[in-house]
Amino acid sequence: MKLVVGLGNPGTQYAQTRHNVGWLVVNEVARRWGATWRKEKDAEVAEIRLGPAPGVKVLLVKPQTFMNASGKAVVPRLSFFKLDPGALLVVQDDLDSPFGLMKVRLGGRHGGQNGVRDIIRLLGTEAFARLKLGISRPPAGRDPADWVLSRWRDEEQSTLGDLVRLGADAVERWATAGLAEAQQAFNSTDLRPRPEPVPAPQPADVSGPQETGPAERPEV
């Protein structure tokens, strides 16, 4: 059995914010497999099976504790199902990666992500997998705490849709094939929008007018 946790904040006002990209990914996984979310203590959960029959049982989890207390929805479930940290994947936003980049990694510090910070604190180890989805640093002068709670801009929606789709693919690959294969398949993902190429300037015509001979007299 595997536990996949999408980090985010509860409430419709947060549903389309940068901090909730983890929720978008686990929602997409649940949608693909026809899973129904149900309310439990501190979380909404959905069960699916991935891979060839009988498949790998995966419990998708969306903490309902607000970001800073995410560990309360995660650690008791690991304990209840007698799972070690190697069975856990946390899907999170990542301020330190440009929007459009995605990476799967094992362990490491929380990097200022307070949901991950709380899971590490309650679990007592950093040794669990993360799927990190880049949301970029805020523009100069903008508070990061305000930035992560801001909504996606209209021009970001297309890239966001691709990022969520590939994030769901990465969750499925991790659950069925393991960490190394998920890293190999998805750590080169780069969906950053490319600027339109600027046409090269055309050289000016400096040849000048062409000399011509006298006009021929028409025959009569």
Curated annotation (Swiss-Prot):
The active site is at H19. It is found in: Cytoplasm. Keywords: Cytoplasm, Hydrolase, RNA-binding, tRNA-binding. InterPro entries: Pept_tRNA_hydro (IPR001328), Pept_tRNA_hydro_CS (IPR018171), Pept_tRNA_hydro_sf (IPR036416). The record marks N9 as: Discriminates between blocked and unblocked aminoacyl-tRNA. GO terms for molecular function: peptidyl-tRNA hydrolase activity; tRNA binding. GO terms for biological process: protein quality control for misfolded or incompletely synthesized proteins; rescue of stalled ribosome. GO terms for cellular component: cytoplasm. Residues 184-220 are annotated as: Disordered. The record marks D93 as: Stabilizes the basic form of H active site to accept a proton. It comes from the Bacteria. Belongs to the PTH family. This is Peptidyl-tRNA hydrolase. It comes from Deinococcus deserti (strain DSM 17065 / CIP 109153 / LMG 22923 / VCD115). The gene is pth.
